[in-house]
């Protein structure tokens, strides 16, 4: 049996069309297009690629993007002052600071400085807290994108065993909260987890985000399980791969996301969905 591929690219396109239609509705009502401020500090090549793809997606959806490309020498205070200005600007709906940041800047201080209503990444403790108490406002992009993928493929987590491998603030923890919200029974695995293979083998829905190539072995996957691979790693050969052994897992799973073309496009599309939501909240 070979798993059905979950086509994140196609679902992301569909979501972008939906966002574009939402922008069109705003314009028809005489409102302005949503605006996203994107702040890049330094010249990390991977970050520059991510920022470029976000700008391109904004253009496609009719969202205005405002770029702040700052030198690597930017101080924390300078960055916080820029964020303060954007928080106060009624013409800006979303503020995104591309991570990682240079070592002189504390990322948590930066995340917490963003107005929670404009925190389109969904990283602010206020937004994570709201998700935890079943009152989501700005939902973290990757976990929300994963839930959209499941929905599109008719996969309902309710009553299922969801296993999350990785407990990062960006993916693992908020993903567990999203699954709880969808009424799954949730297990989170991390570096202190014993018998990882056993935990993975129990999963009806498996979400992996650890940043280690082929970390989860295909033979661990429960037959018929849904496998969502959030990892994206570049091997020495230049090839991209995920955190799950794809070929072996594909033979056992019911559904699986490829890398690339699975979760990645959903993260960007969800960012724009959040920006539109923010604009509509702020009227």
Swiss-Prot record:
Quaternary structure, from the entry: Homodimer.
Q: One GO molecular function term? A: methenyltetrahydrofolate cyclohydrolase activity
Q: What is this protein called?
A: Bifunctional protein FolD
NCBIfam families the UniProt entry points to: PRK10792.1, PRK14186.1
The metabolic or biological pathway listed in the UniProt record of this protein is: One-carbon metabolism; tetrahydrofolate interconversion
| SUPFAM superfamilies linked | Aminoacid dehydrogenase-like, N-terminal domain, NAD(P)-binding Rossmann-fold domains
Q: Which organism is it from?
A: Chromobacterium violaceum (strain ATCC 12472 / DSM 30191 / JCM 1249 / CCUG 213 / NBRC 12614 / NCIMB 9131 / NCTC 9757 / MK)
Q: Which reaction does it catalyse?
A: (6R)-5,10-methylene-5,6,7,8-tetrahydrofolate + NADP(+) = (6R)-5,10-methenyltetrahydrofolate + NADPH; (6R)-5,10-methenyltetrahydrofolate + H2O = (6R)-10-formyltetrahydrofolate + H(+)
């Amino acid at each position: 049996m070979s798993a059905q591929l979950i086509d994140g690219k196609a679902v992301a396109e569909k979501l972008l069309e939906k966002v574009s239609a939402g922008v069109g509705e705003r314009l028809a009502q005489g409102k302005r297009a949503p605006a996203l401020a994107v702040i890049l500090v330094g010249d990390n090549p991977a970050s520059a690629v991510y920022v470029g793809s976000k700008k391109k997606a904004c253009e496609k959806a009719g969202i205005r993007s405002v770029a702040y490309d700052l030198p690597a020498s930017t101080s924390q205070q300078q960055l916080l002052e820029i964020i303060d200005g954007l928080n106060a600007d009624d013409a800006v709906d979303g503020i995104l600071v591309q991570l990682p940041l240079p070592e002189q800047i504390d990322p948590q201080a930066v995340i917490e400085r963003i107005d929670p209503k404009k925190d389109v990444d969904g990283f602010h403790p206020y937004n994570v807290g709201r998700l935890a108490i079943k009152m989501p406002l700005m939902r973290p992009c990757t976990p929300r994108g994963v839930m959209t993928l499941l929905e599109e493929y008719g996969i309902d987590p309710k009553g299922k065993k969801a296993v999350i491998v990785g407990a990062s603030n960006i993916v693992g923890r908020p993903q567990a909260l999203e699954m709880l919200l969808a009424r799954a029974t949730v297990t989170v695995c991390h570096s202190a987890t014993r018998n990882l293979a056993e935990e993975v083998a129990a999963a009806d829905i498996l979400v992996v985000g650890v940043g280690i190539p082929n970390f989860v072995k295909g033979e661990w996957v429960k037959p018929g399980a849904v496998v969502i691979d959030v990892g994206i790693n570049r091997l020495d050969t230049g090839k991209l791969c995920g955190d799950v052994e794809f070929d072996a897992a594909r033979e056992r799973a019911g559904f699986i996301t490829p890398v690339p073309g699975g979760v990645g496009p959903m993260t960007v599309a969800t960012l724009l969905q959040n920006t539109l939501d923010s604009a509509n909240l702020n009227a």
